[in-house]
Amino acid sequence: VTEHLKRIDAYLAPGVFRDHQAPPAKEPELIASVIIPVGFRPEFIGTAIESVQAQTIQDIECIVMVNGGEEDPTADVVRKYMKGGEKYDSKKPDVRLVVLDINNIGLCLNIGSKLSRAKYYVQLDSDDRLKPDAVEKVLKVFESDPEIGMVIGSYEVWEKKDNGELVRMKEIPVVTHDEWTDDNGRNNLLRINGAGAPRCIPIHVIKEMGYFSINDDPHARNYGEDYEMVNKIAEYYRIGRVWDPIYEVVRHGGGTDHAIDQNTVDRNDNAKDDMRREAILRRQVFNRDRKKK
């Protein structure tokens, strides 16, 4: 892939980036907002919230974006962790709730980012969990280099049994995405379908990129908005990595990646192919403009 990108003038050389904006001078109120889009998963959301509240860094908030409308029972579970709820604890990070009747993950992430009181966005899927030191380790990477515009972690794969028990799938090693090297990771990204988890981004960088896509691609149906964001950010900033597992992906029968039909697989593949095509076109224009200078 790297050699092909060089042939078509879409290769991004090490250390070559687009000009990017300076971060805002005013420091936000909090250090991180963990934003969780969710729809009709009342049996999972409590575990996800508790993994946020168990972080070693407590200067954070949890924003839950329920996208199934008020009839979605997930919202009532979230309210238990808010002021007046039976699981509310004033000593733990705040839980904020937004209820939408539009099932659009990109829209949820964009609204959550705009509501954020924090410096960084941290990704968490509603059926997954953060390790207790996830935010702490991510922040250390950001602090190591001001040119880093995104940090991506590594994750373990767990399984939720029929009895509700969560079990680590030890036959699957920690997923580190080793192809994401400092020199060539952003070129390698065009040949793979994912970059790793969790994904953490300064809020001002999300705004600079024009926010997450909201099913703009004709093939995208709540799929690939994060992949597109990684590709865009990698053109402007270094991507930092946490190689230790700081995230737990939970497999279960109701997961969006579980036993999906071939038509959905094909549509998702087409969506990411379109995103790759757009990335290649942007890179070609960027490289041509650089040569003119």
Question: Over which residues does each language-model region extend?
Answer:
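N-proximal low-complexity "stem/linker" segments adjacent to membrane-targeting elements
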Residues: V1-S51
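Glycine-rich, basic loop-to-helix element that forms the pyrophosphate-binding segment
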Residues: L100-S116
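Catalytic beta-strand/loop signature of glycosyltransferases that borders the donor
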Residues: S154, G240-I246
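Acidic donor-binding loop at a coil-to-helix junction in glycosyltransferase catalytic cores
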Residues: H219-M229
